[in-house]
């Protein structure tokens, strides 16, 4: 894969882009292709720009971790100054087009999504506290709310409650991954939940958070009267998450934690697809 494409973290940002599209299609009475395309373009540029900036800022961390040592910057495939310029150009384009093409309120959420990931999480919190992902997680809320604001022209409590399905899923997902690579994070000096609270406590917290996230997603879907097809999709992901989360909580083994991580990965995607299906 081209190193500049890798800098965009496509396996991460596609879910944020999907969240923005789901917010738009869920809220718009009469969605149109031009608006949807503009939203996708803006979401791609702003999230990709933030991801590329994260690569630039964390290049020393990436070099110290086995999991990330082959990324473009520590591997010498991209010069740091080029990565910085690339990230800033994409970010500026995404934010500017967010205001120009989508309007003031959606544009504000585009900016907030970028800010929470690139500045709050990456620059301010990542190396300082294990609570870093709780600050950065608001980027997930913002992407959904930006799409919702574009479709509805406003943001209401309904939208905020749905956006917190994303917020709850993010730390449970990231911490489960961090548990597997906890030695890497210790080596790099990055505080993450599994490296600061002890392994048994981390397993309990992550498992319970996964269970809470799955339960919240299912409750939201039922409370807002979702359809049968979408309900089947969401239920499949939720059941898998609850089953593996309960098993991880009971056994507290690395294998069980990894199974929970893999099982919980699709649940947010299924929820967002269900929102689109019910639009």
Swiss-Prot record:
Keywords linked to the UniProt accession: Cell membrane, Heme biosynthesis, Membrane, Transferase, Transmembrane, Transmembrane helix
Organism: Pyrobaculum arsenaticum (strain DSM 13514 / JCM 11321 / PZ6)
Similarity field: Belongs to the UbiA prenyltransferase family. Protoheme IX farnesyltransferase subfamily.
NCBIfam families (alphabetical): cyoE_ctaB
GO terms for biological process, alphabetical: heme O biosynthetic process
Gene assigned in the entry: ctaB
Additional observations: Carbon 2 of the heme B porphyrin ring is defined according to the Fischer nomenclature.
Cell compartment(s), UniProt: Cell membrane
Cited function: Converts heme B (protoheme IX) to heme O by substitution of the vinyl group on carbon 2 of heme B porphyrin ring with a hydroxyethyl farnesyl side group.
Catalysed conversion reaction: heme b + (2E,6E)-farnesyl diphosphate + H2O = Fe(II)-heme o + diphosphate
GO CC list: plasma membrane
Name of the molecule in the record: Protoheme IX farnesyltransferase
Annotated metabolic or biological route of this protein: Porphyrin-containing compound metabolism; heme O biosynthesis; heme O from protoheme: step 1/1
Transmembrane segments annotated in the record for this chain: 5-25, 33-53, 84-103, 108-125, 133-153, 159-179, 201-221, 222-242, 256-276
EC assignment: 2.5.1.141
Keyword Transferase part of the UniProt annotation: yes
Pfam families: UbiA
Signal peptide limits: none
InterPro entries: Protohaem_IX_farnesylTrfase, UbiA_prenyltransferase, UbiA_prenylTrfase_CS, UbiA_sf
Topology with respect to the bilayer: Multi-pass membrane protein
């Amino acid at each position: 894969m081209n190193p500049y494409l890798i800098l965009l973290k496509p396996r991460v940002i596609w879910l944020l882009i999907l969240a923005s599209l789901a917010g738009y299609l869920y809220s718009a009475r009469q969605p149109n292709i031009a608006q949807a395309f503009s939203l996708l373009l803006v979401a791609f540029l702003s999230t990709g720009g933030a991801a590329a900036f994260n690569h630039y800022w964390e290049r020393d961390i990436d070099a110290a971790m086995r999991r990330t040592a082959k990324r473009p910057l520590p591997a010498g495939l991209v010069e740091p100054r080029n990565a910085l310029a690339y990230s800033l150009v994409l970010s500026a384009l995404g934010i500017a087009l967010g205001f120009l093409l989508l309007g003031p309120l959606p544009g504000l959420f585009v900016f907030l999504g970028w800010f929470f990931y690139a500045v709050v999480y990456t620059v301010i919190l990542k190396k300082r506290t294990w609570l870093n992902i709780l600050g950065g997680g608001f980027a997930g809320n913002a992407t959904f709310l930006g799409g919702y604001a574009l479709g509805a022209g406003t943001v209401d409590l309904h939208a905020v409650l749905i956006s917190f399905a994303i917020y709850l899923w993010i730390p449970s997902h990231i911490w489960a991954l961090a548990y597997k690579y906890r030695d890497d994070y210790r080596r790099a000096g990055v505080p993450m939940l599994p490296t600061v609270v002890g392994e048994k406590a981390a397993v309990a917290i992550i498992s319970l958070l996964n269970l809470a996230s799955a339960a919240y997603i299912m409750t939201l879907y039922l409370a807002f009267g979702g359809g049968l097809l979408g309900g089947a999709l969401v239920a499949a992901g939720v059941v898998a998450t609850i089953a593996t989360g309960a098993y991880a909580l009971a056994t507290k083994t690395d294998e069980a934690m990894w199974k929970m991580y893999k099982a919980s990965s699709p649940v947010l995607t299924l929820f967002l697809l269900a929102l689109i299906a019910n639009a």
